[in-house]
Amino acid sequence: MQTGVYSAQKKDGTVYYRANITYQTKHISLGSFSSEEDAHSAYLEACNLLENEAVTLFNIHSQIRHLSFDKAVCLLNFRDNHLYFHNPIYLRKGYFSYFLSDDMELKFDIDDLFYYAGHRIQKRQGHLFVSDYGMQYSILSRYGIKPYAVTGRDYLFFNGDTHDFRYSNILNIN
C-alpha cells in the first residue's frame, strides 16, 4: 500500500481506497477513491498544498486534480490560519469566506464563523440555506429577513455584492 492510502471494503464486498494525511498532529481524511493510484495522487496533492506556500486560493485549480475543491480550501486554511474546519471556509482579516463552489465565494462576519463551521450551506434553485435538526433555514433569516422577502424591495446589499453577507453590508428594510 502506498503512503497515505489504505483499502476498505463496501458492504457488497467491493474494494475502495481511502486517502488521509496527518498534518500538525491532525489526521485529515481526503476522501474515497476507486483506485490506489488515485488515492495516492490525492495524498501527494494534499502534501503539495500543505508544504508549498506559493499555492494560494487564486492558483489552486492548477494544483488539484484528485482532491475536491472543498477539501483543498480546508487544507489551505489549515496551513495558513492553523484552524481546520470540515466546511470550505477560509479565514480573512475580520471576516471569512465560505466557498459554495470554486466560482462562488460567500463572505460572512467572523461572528458567524462557528455557526457556519458546523452547518453546511446548500443552494437549491438560487436559494441559500442550512439544515439544522431536520429543518431548512434560509441564511437570510439570521439577519431578520423573511423567506418571502425580495432583494431591492425588502432588503439591500450596500456594496451591490449579493454574496457579501457581512452585517454591515445588509440593510433590512421590511
What is the meaning of each model-derived region?
Residues 1-31, 78-174:
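Short, Arg/Lys-rich segments that mark the N-terminal edge of DNA/RNA- and chromatin-recognition modules
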Residues 19, 39-47:
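An aromatic-rich alpha-helical recognition segment common to small helix-rich domains
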Residues 33-36:
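Conserved aromatic
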Residues 53-85:
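Intrinsically disordered, low-complexity charged/polar segments
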